[in-house]
């Protein structure tokens, strides 16, 4: 019976191991030493000019900022703030959003209350949601509520809060803002019975309501009338809003010819406004930029390059976005055009081989391939007329109608219908009942109500501003020869593309630019692409020696000079250069200093030097996709507390638990550590004798000695090297005295088999153990039975994905450090091969436990 029970327990352990095998991976919090595309955190440092070592992989939206610093310029505080906002949106995959308008709405609601007093039921749009904010969509901007609040303040000051006309004004404004949710609501037209101020205000309120309800024809007509009334306080505003209305109208049109005509009319209107000295001149210029973006993108990208390169303007944030999106658009068009050309030539080759079609015909097709259409308007979207099982999809009747999708309460049927933009809820219900053929239930009415509101919101958001047309996902690589000429005419655009392209073409062009300009910008670009035998390399290296260390270009130039010296075998020169940089007071970004340290580690002549220079400092940590400091994570998690979410804990108890959970991680906030590349070198090139020497090195901080001791002991045991295991055991016990009893079982074992089983039992009971050095923060949890993703170890991967070929390829052995002998490296690789054969911990220990239970059924440990 005991045998059966123990076998069942052993089997349970195996299943537990296998369950744990699937998610083998790193711990949840991992150090960040370098970003591929973004600046290091905090972004404010890069925006302020601390650009460090630039990389071609950094996105253009980042390199744009570097360009101005490399040319001796800088950014104002407002521009730096704009840069950080754009980067936060770009790299957190969040939409570009304007300021939250909730506080402005609150002010308006409070001001309104001073007139209407206490209401039994205020308008729904003024009811704050449980989770904060108001249910407005972006058509009603922050400025709309600021204007309403200021105007009401003025009217109260002039006429008093109890004045019947002021109260009527507020009711009319409520009607205007109803359009911010959906549907069409218009206040009563002005009449002669109203005082003159009220007539002027009401005319504007009517036009504004039409604008917000997307009735652009009526809005344009009424704004134009107000613009001709020079006695109206809204004359300047209305004149500007005529252009705004036309832009909105054009953005909704799918008719390209009509769209361009409307944009042209808007451009004429806004040009007149921009030429005047009025409070809307700057706003008009912003709108003119949007029109150029849509009608003449080639012209706009050149204009933006010249603005951004030197001084910027009041629209700097949007200029950055538009410029970056246009570059992405033109790059995509160039690469797709190249794809098409290659496809046609491949067809020609196929025909030539098969003689299936006259080659001249295909050559003609290649010649007729369309030019990159940089000025194309918005593509026409087809209307979906498909019909699917248990679904009914109505054909769209009128351009601009809102698409509504609803479903039956049992989810077995769905219907798609279209309603006019200005339809009310009741009109939408009636249309839905006609399409469905029966009355709507209350739940279905709520579906229609919400779907109409979301469709209304989406109709505006989809056409509010420039549209992103970039994003190339094919296999072509960009080269300078593929770019159209207009992208080479402005220095900023020319540099951005040149810095990012790879290969000798980019080097030779950058070299020619440096010869012409003798600038740090083009020296940096050329030397970053140079190889050890590149043309005129000596000229670049000599120029690199003369760069002022305080120049923004210096870190990148120095890094690549060191790289080239290393490639040329001039290790002493490279070592001296790197030591000078690392020992200087140069204020480098953490990630840039890490790159210099990594170079210096490769030149180490001793093990101690290697361990010293290979230690890097993370600039931030990643926790489930969020980057920040450990303190940031603690603060974030503390903010999650609410009495409703944690009814059994006080805030103090909850925060104490958070502190306890992060106790180990907090220790690593300012520590240096080895990155994954260095750990890989050690695991594959350091045999046990070298690892023993490394563990004793004074170059290692105390917290890393523990990691080496545990890995050495575990590796030695798995390789049946119990002599080495005995040597390192005292170090293991220094850090983990709780293992003394289990270690004694090993030491006092009378036979080799007993020793192996005692060692296996110790490993089994301590999931922190692995024969491989761990990178990152290592393992803090050593609780057996509480399985984590990083318990014990996973077998090293023997293949990896190659992005160039799109195939799995053999993992390449990292270069051997120069202080190691070939014999030492070979010994390490032999050990590594044996560990690979052992495989994952779950498989290995599961098999050993089963074998143990079979051979020693009375052993109480299994």
Where are these regions (language model features)?
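Extracytoplasmic/secretory-pathway proteins
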Residues: 21-224, 230, 234-242, 248-392, ...
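Bacterial N-terminal signal peptides that target proteins for export
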Residues: 1-8
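Bacterial N-terminal signal peptides
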Residues: 8-16
């Amino acid at each position: 019976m005991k045998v059966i029970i123990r076998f069942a327990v052993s089997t349970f352990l195996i299943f537990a191991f296998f369950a744990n095998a699937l998610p083998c991976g790193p711990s949840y919090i991992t150090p960040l030493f370098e970003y591929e595309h973004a600046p290091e955190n905090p972004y404010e440092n890069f925006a302020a000019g601390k650009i460090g070592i630039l990389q071609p992989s950094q996105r253009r939206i980042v390199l744009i900022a570097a360009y101005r610093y490399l040319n001796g310029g800088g950014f104002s505080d407002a521009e730096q703030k704009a840069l950080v906002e754009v980067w936060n949106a770009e790299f957190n995959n969040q939409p570009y959003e304007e300021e939250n308008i909730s506080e402005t709405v609150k002010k308006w609601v409070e001001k309104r209350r001073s007139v209407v007093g206490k209401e039994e039921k205020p308008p729904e749009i003024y009811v704050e949601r449980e989770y904060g904010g108001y249910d407005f969509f972006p058509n009603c901007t922050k400025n709309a509520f600021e204007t309403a609040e200021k105007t009401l303040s003025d009217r109260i000051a002039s006429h008093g809060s109890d004045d019947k006309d002021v109260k009527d004004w507020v009711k009319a404004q409520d009607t205007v803002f109803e359009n911010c949710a959906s549907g069409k609501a218009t206040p009563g037209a002005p009449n002669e019975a109203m005082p003159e101020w009220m007539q002027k205000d009401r005319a504007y309120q009517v036009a504004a309501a039409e604008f917000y309800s997307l009735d652009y024809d009526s809005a344009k007509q009424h704004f134009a009338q107000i613009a001709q009334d020079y006695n109206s306080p809204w004359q300047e505003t209305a004149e500007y809003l005529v252009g705004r209305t036309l832009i909105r109208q054009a953005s909704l049109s799918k008719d390209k010819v009509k769209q361009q005509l409307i944009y042209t009319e808007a451009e004429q209107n806004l040009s007149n406004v921009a030429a005047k000295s009025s409070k809307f001149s700057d706003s008009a210029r912003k709108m003119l930029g949007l029109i150029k973006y849509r009608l003449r993108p080639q012209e706009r990208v050149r204009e933006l390059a010249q603005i951004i390169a030197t001084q910027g303007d009041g629209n700097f944030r949007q200029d950055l976005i538009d410029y970056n999106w246009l570059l992405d658009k033109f790059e995509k068009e160039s690469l797709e055009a190249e794809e098409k050309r290659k496809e046609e030539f491949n067809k020609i080759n196929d025909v030539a081989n098969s003689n299936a079609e006259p080659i001249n015909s295909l050559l003609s097709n290649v010649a007729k391939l369309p030019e990159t259409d940089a000025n194309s308007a918005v593509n026409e979207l087809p209307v979906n007329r498909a019909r699917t099982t248990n679904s009914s999809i109505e054909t769209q009747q009128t351009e601009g109608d809102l698409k509504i999708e609803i479903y039956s309460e049992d989810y077995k049927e769905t219907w798609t219908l279209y309603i006019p933009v200005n339809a009310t809820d009741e009109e939408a219900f009636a249309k839905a009942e006609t399409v469905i053929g029966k009355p709507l239930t209350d739940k279905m009415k709520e579906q229609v109500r919400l779907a109409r509101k979301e469709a209304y919101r989406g109709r505006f958001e989809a056409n509010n501003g420039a549209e992103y047309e970039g994003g190339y996902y094919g296999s072509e690589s960009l080269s300078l020869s593929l770019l159209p000429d207009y992208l080479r005419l402005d220095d900023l655009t020319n540099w951005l593309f040149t810095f990012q392209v790879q290969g000798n073409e980019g080097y030779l062009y950058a070299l020619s630019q440096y010869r012409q300009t003798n600038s740090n910008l083009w020296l940096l670009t050329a030397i970053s692409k140079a190889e050890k035998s590149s043309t005129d390399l000596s000229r670049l290296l000599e120029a690199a020696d003369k760069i002022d260390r305080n120049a923004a270009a210096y870190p990148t130039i120095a890094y690549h000079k060191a790289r080239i010296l290393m490639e040329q075998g001039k290790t002493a020169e490279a070592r001296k250069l790197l030591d000078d940089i690392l020992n200087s007071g140069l204020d480098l970004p953490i990630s840039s200093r890490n790159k210099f340290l990594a170079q210096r580690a490769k030149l180490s002549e001793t093990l101690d030097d290697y361990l010293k220079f290979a230690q890097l400092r993370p600039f931030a940590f990643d926790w489930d996709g969020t980057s920040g400091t450990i303190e940031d994570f603690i603060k974030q998690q503390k903010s999650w507390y609410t009495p409703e979410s944690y009814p059994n804990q006080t805030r103090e108890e909850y925060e104490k638990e958070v502190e306890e959970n992060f106790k180990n991680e907090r220790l690593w906030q300012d520590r240096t550590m080895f990155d994954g590349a260095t750990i890989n070198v050690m695991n594959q090139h350091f045999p046990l004798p070298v690892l023993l020497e490394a563990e004793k090195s004074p170059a290692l901080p105390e917290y890393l000695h523990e990691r080496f001791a545990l890995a050495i002991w575990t590796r030695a045991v798995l390789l049946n090297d119990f002599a080495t295991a005995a040597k390192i055991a005292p170090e293991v016990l220094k850090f983990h005295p709780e293992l003394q009893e289990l270690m004694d079982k090993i030491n006092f074992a009378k036979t080799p088999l007993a020793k192996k089983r005692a060692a296996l039992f110790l490993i089994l009971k301590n999931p922190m153990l692995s024969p491989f050095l761990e990178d990152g923060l290592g393992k803090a949890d050593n609780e057996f039975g509480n399985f984590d993703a990083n318990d014990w170890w996973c077998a090293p991967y023997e293949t990896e994905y190659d992005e160039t070929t799109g195939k799995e390829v053999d993992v390449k052995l990292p270069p051997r450090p120069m202080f190691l002998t070939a014999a030492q490296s070979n010994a390490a690789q032999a050990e590594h091969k044996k560990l690979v054969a052992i495989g994952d911990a779950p498989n290995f220990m599961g098999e050993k436990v089963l074998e143990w239970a079979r051979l020693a059924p009375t052993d109480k440990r299994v």
